[in-house]
Amino acid sequence: MKNLLFFSHNQKKILEVESIFDHKGVKIHNLRSFEKIKEPYESGVSFAENAKIKSSFGLKNFEIPCFADDSGICVEALKNKPGIKSKRFLEKFASNENAFEYIISNVIKTKNNKAFFKTAICLSITNNHHIVFEGKINGKIAIKPKGSNGFGYDPIFIPQGYEKTFAEMSIKEKNTISHRKIALMKLESFLFN
């Protein structure tokens, strides 16, 4: 495959993908290269199902092999929520800070700070050929948000084996250990090995 579509408008995700596929001889297109398109509603009950909904939609509409990701944070104190609704969870609060405060207060109340990030990437090659690659990183919720890098829940997530949040790490450092990186490396291995 010489051309692939990464079904995303998210500039930070796009940069992460481009850094991994740089110099691989594959042109990675993204939704920012095209006219604004309405993304499909993510009605799946798992990260993999939501990724497949998006990658299938991209393949159908652009007629090019497409991959998409669905990612989220799962917090034990919230019974592994927000999970697949991570983006919508942030949107229902007036600000990320309010969402973080809600999560942290539940972590303190339950005395359980365990959490993990999960990513599923689905590659849709044809209408009947879809392959899913997953990545997961365990960690814990910080007692207060720290750092200004990254996006989403990065200021409150401390990966296992580290003392700083994803948002305190450089983009390069985060991208060497992140859940998305793990899934993208599996995709890369499939495409190039």
Residue ranges and their predicted role:
Residues 2-7, 11-193:
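Anionic-ligand binding patches
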